[in-house]
Regions:
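Hydrophobic/aromatic-rich transmembrane helices and adjacent perimembrane loops
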Residues: 160-161, 358, 362-395
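Intrinsically disordered, polar/acidic, low-complexity terminal segments
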Residues: 5-7, 11-134, 224-235, 252-338, ...
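Membrane-interface alpha helices of multi-pass inner-membrane proteins
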Residues: 186-202, 207
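Juxtamembrane "helix-exit" motif on the non-cytosolic side of transmembrane helices
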Residues: 32-34, 92-95, 142-154, 245-252, ...
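Transmembrane alpha-helix segments characteristic
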Residues: 137-138, 332-363, 413-420
Length: 601
């Protein structure tokens, strides 16, 4: 009776959509761990500048400027042809760059749009909604979350890689629609989307290989010619984009040698270098970054700081995959499954090859056995399709064995446990970025609350947080973004390596406690040349700070004697900031050792 009820439930037309919906909820929760990380790479300056621009420019002017930039690119006035690229182009999507959480959720939205379209394209190409659902449930677990956040497009670069893959997937869907209807508009749309992908990021050129695999799967014939004919539409868009790309490079080179007016620039990092050993090494290392556990295995990362949310996400996502596997009654043929695997391999290897031939990444600094570069996230889509094909092979193998009915429950539990463990391991490892995110947040909130306003625009403000490695332009952009002030900002690490003769210097620092409720930032006037001690200290408390907490610090007298102090917050002068935080003024004492300031619960 119970078995019949179970079959009735799983046989319902709503069962598969519900499983996919559950997978989406827990997949989003799982991947949203990326919101804990600070900005990395070029985001540290681009996001600040672009958000300041969008908040100080009328929206119509933003649209007009963006349109002019696209036309400028189409007129071959840019060294690289990327009219549809996200960063560093300033457009309306710059609104999503101003907050760590919003920015990462913006990237996650692009990623899940790609997941949904990949699953849809898989279902169309294989003529199996269940295989599409399997791809949808598997793909969230395929991304390598523990990687250097400066080059992982789950964290950085405004979803550049994801926004390149999305029009490729749309081109594929339009291509298949053209096959069904023979209406030329679908061929034109397919060509346009492929043109758009190649004009977003150069890895777009490599995806024609994967689209060929999709076309061959869909035509289902034993001959290659129908698939090649179907690929004419997206290939034409790619060829047109390639012409613009080469034209832009030619104009740039002619300017560099003085034949054309204007100043050309060196774009050597995106020009090919065909040193075969270097290409193969970089190619393989970049491909390895597309596998979910590769970085943690090579980095010898152990699953620590595991929280209940990690376990819940792992169990739920694994259960969704197992539910779809249980529904797979009709398996694709061996040839179809091989084509699916090779299509995934093309999605994995083709973008990695473009990185492999670039001299910028052949030096072993940006790409190694633990870290890949930007395309690694979209490479994981290929790993996901390969995993779907591997599951089909395993199902075909075990379903023909006499022992399968007896061992099926045990094998299913072991498989689910392995997938759940992968999720738990990845999510807990990604939490290692949390302290960096907390530091960035409390530091930014302090500046936003006006902590450094008293210093004005002339007095140097030396910051403990090194924005973009302490770059002066980035430091200034940070204050423009969060305080709307043209602050004379410097990095403490850089300041201490230089000679300065300013009479008054302020130091802006921060201290992380045991959790977010005890994080603080502070400003004081330097009392020594090395900025170790400060006077006239004001402390910023975030709105979630413990109101019953105590500020602890150490003072250093002129004779070098240090004394520890504690001040209950209730006994200190407090001013409410507009962002919900609180500014607390410490009483005048001997100079305070800045690194000792902390909030205790």
């Amino acid at each position: 009776m119970e078995r019949n009820n179970l079959k009735k439930i799983t046989g319902s037309r709503w069962f598969l959509p519900v499983v996919c919906a559950v997978s989406f909820v827990f997949g989003w929760w799982y991947l949203s761990i990326t919101t804990c990380a600070p900005l990395g790479g070029d985001d540290e300056i681009i996001n600040l500048q672009n958000y300041y621009y969008i908040t100080h420019t009328p929206w119509w002017q933003v649209v007009l400027t963006h349109a002019k930039e696209i036309l400028n690119q189409l007129a071959l006035q840019s060294p690289r042809f990327r009219p549809f690229s996200s960063p560093p182009v300033r457009s309306l999507n710059s609104w999503f760059l101003g907050d760590l959480v919003v920015y990462r959720l913006y990237i996650l939205a692009w990623t899940y749009a790609d997941i949904a379209l990949t699953a849809w394209l898989t279902a169309k190409a294989t003529h199996s909604k269940k295989l599409g659902a399997l791809a949808f449930c598997l793909l969230p677990m395929m991304f390598s979350l523990w990687q250097d956040a400066t080059g992982n497009s789950m964290y950085s670069y405004g979803a550049l890689a994801q926004s390149t893959l999305l029009p490729v997937l749309l081109a594929g869907l339009c291509m298949l629609r053209w096959q069904d209807t023979h209406h030329m508009r679908w061929a034109v749309l397919s060509a346009f989307f492929m043109f758009m992908a190649c004009g977003t990021f150069e890895i777009g050129f490599t995806y024609i290989a994967a689209l060929f695999g999709i076309a061959w799967l869909y035509t289902g014939s034993g001959k290659v010619l129908p698939a090649l004919r179907l690929c004419v539409a997206p290939l034409s868009g790619e060829v047109i984009s390639f012409g613009f790309n080469m034209g832009s490079r030619l104009v740039n080179n002619l300017r560099r040698v003085g034949i054309l007016e204007g100043q050309g620039i060196d774009i050597g990092g995106v020009s090919p270098n065909f040193d075969l050993p270097a290409v193969l090494r970089t190619w393989v290392m970049q491909m390895s970054a597309g596998f979910p556990l590769n970085a943690m295995v090579f980095g010898k990362i152990k699953p620590t700081n595991v929280q209940i949310s990690d376990v819940i996400c792992g169990v739920a996502l694994a259960a969704c995959v197992m539910a779809v596997l249980a529904l797979l009654d009709r398996l694709p043929t061996r040839k179809e499954n091989l084509l699916l695997f090779l299509t995934g391999l093309a999605l994995l290897s083709a973008p990695a090859l473009l990185i492999g031939i670039s001299p910028k990444y052949q030096d072993g600094i940006n790409v190694d056995w633990r870290h890949g570069y930007i395309p690694q996230t979209v490479e994981s889509f290929g790993v996901g399709l390969m995993a779907v094909a591997v599951f089909v092979v395993l199902l075909r193998f075990v379903r023909g064995k006499n022992w399968w009915p007896k061992l099926r429950p045990v094998c299913s539990v072991l498989l689910a446990a392995g997938m759940a463990f992968s999720v738990v391991w990845q999510r807990s490892a990604a939490r290692s970025y949390e302290k960096g995110g907390r530091a960035y947040t409390v530091f930014a909130e302090g500046v936003e609350a006006g902590l450094a306003d008293a210093a004005g625009t002339e007095t140097p403000v030396v910051t403990d947080y090194p924005v973009w490695g302490g770059d002066l332009e980035a430091e200034n952009a940070f204050f423009l973004r969060y305080a709307d002030t043209d602050t004379n900002a410097h990095s403490l690490a850089v300041w201490r390596t230089e000679s300065h003769d300013e009479a008054t210097v302020c130091r802006l620092g921060f201290a992380l406690g045991s959790d977010k409720r005890t994080d603080i930032s502070w400003l004081g006037t330097a009392a020594d040349d090395n900025l170790d001690t400060v006077t006239g200290v004001t402390v910023y408390l975030p709105k979630q700070a413990d109101p019953a907490g105590t500020l602890a610090y150490t003072t250093r007298a002129a004779d070098g004697i240090e004394t520890e102090h504690t001040q209950p917050l209730a006994e200190l002068a407090q001013t409410k900031a507009e962002n919900g935080g609180t500014l607390v003024t410490l009483p005048e004492t001997a100079p305070i050792v800045g690194d000792t300031l902390r909030l205790q619960s």
